[in-house]
């Protein structure tokens, strides 16, 4: 039996991601003393993580961009700091996309295909589908694209029917989900300005982490339970046996980890036991929101020997002329669905690098680094992260798509330079030196990337439940607790500031 008196704190913050760090920073700025940030990992930053690769190159293996830069307060703060000290903290890397098909090669800006124009119509079709009438049932993004093709086939060429669906799927790389898992209602969303590529997020994390007393931070400390006492205080129990008592608690763990608290299995890493349990409105909200698995693979080359025409390249999933025939011949949407299901069931092919779209950021153009940063979605992310240490297997999997990209960028096939082989005298040929893979689906304290919607989900329920808190003293912050900036670093940052400001006002 633990007879040690709990250490008393004003506010305890659980999680040292950007939401938790900003909450601590805001509390300190507002004059609140004696707070504590408990972090299960041995580092700060959460899903912001900068890693070092070949020749000391740095990459963000978690979030990479400041999105919505017209309205993003974290970006505007960074921009002001750059004005003050002249340091480059980001680059705007928006660009015209290069789209590559395995058979046809480049299909972007094609005078006959005009895929970008038809894709724009597809986004308008989605908007009209769900916003012209109230109560329209949700479906998967895949089903919505099929509906568009069926209704508009009279006005589409065979090649447009073949390639457009695969081009539309680049949106999978925003959400971290396959189009058959993704809510059609939630697929398209407005962007408030351009995207700025961070150089790098570790400087943002360290700046915020150093803006409050360092003795507030306790790393490698997993929280096991949170109990609301009759005295109105909150008791926090940690895995290492330490016990704390606080006036307020801000919980910033990811939605995927918080979800463990409503599962019957109690011995899961990261799971927090709540006493009393999370209130019904929070438990119910988990039924209306899910989690995506956006993963990253970094391909590091000796030097850049490819065209820097664009910083953005998407390779399209394979398509067939048989698909076009099915779309042309289907009597209605139900028949189209069943015909496509039948065709799928007859294919017993294993997953390849051409089974889904992939998004490559050509860092050579945007930052001068001879590397590609590739984004992938579930379920591919789960598979690739499970073999992340086997670099030869990774290279073998992605080699066909890398070679195709190099060909389209006026270069040669990729040479495997990861093994110490003598005499790689390959002037002006792309020599691959290293592969780095993210680990978010296998990390027990992230269990994926960020919140995402399956068909029928409604993220508003979770945001409302989280922003109202468990009660007046047990509060929540993180990207899943806010509407503006949901799924983004700045949304998490803003939610941490929101909760800390609220508590500061109550304590004054």
Curated annotation (Swiss-Prot):
The keyword Flavoprotein applies. It comes from Saccharomyces cerevisiae (strain ATCC 204508 / S288c) (Baker's yeast). PANTHER family: FLAVIN MONOAMINE OXIDASE, LYSINE-SPECIFIC HISTONE DEMETHYLASE 2. The gene is FMS1. It holds the Pfam family Amino_oxidase. This is Polyamine oxidase FMS1. One of its GO terms (cellular component) is cytoplasm. Present with 6960 molecules/cell in log phase SD medium. Binds 1 FAD per subunit. Keywords: FAD, Flavoprotein, Oxidoreductase. Involved in the production of beta-alanine, a precursor of pantothenic acid. Multicopy suppressor of fenpropimorph resistance. It comes from the Eukaryota.
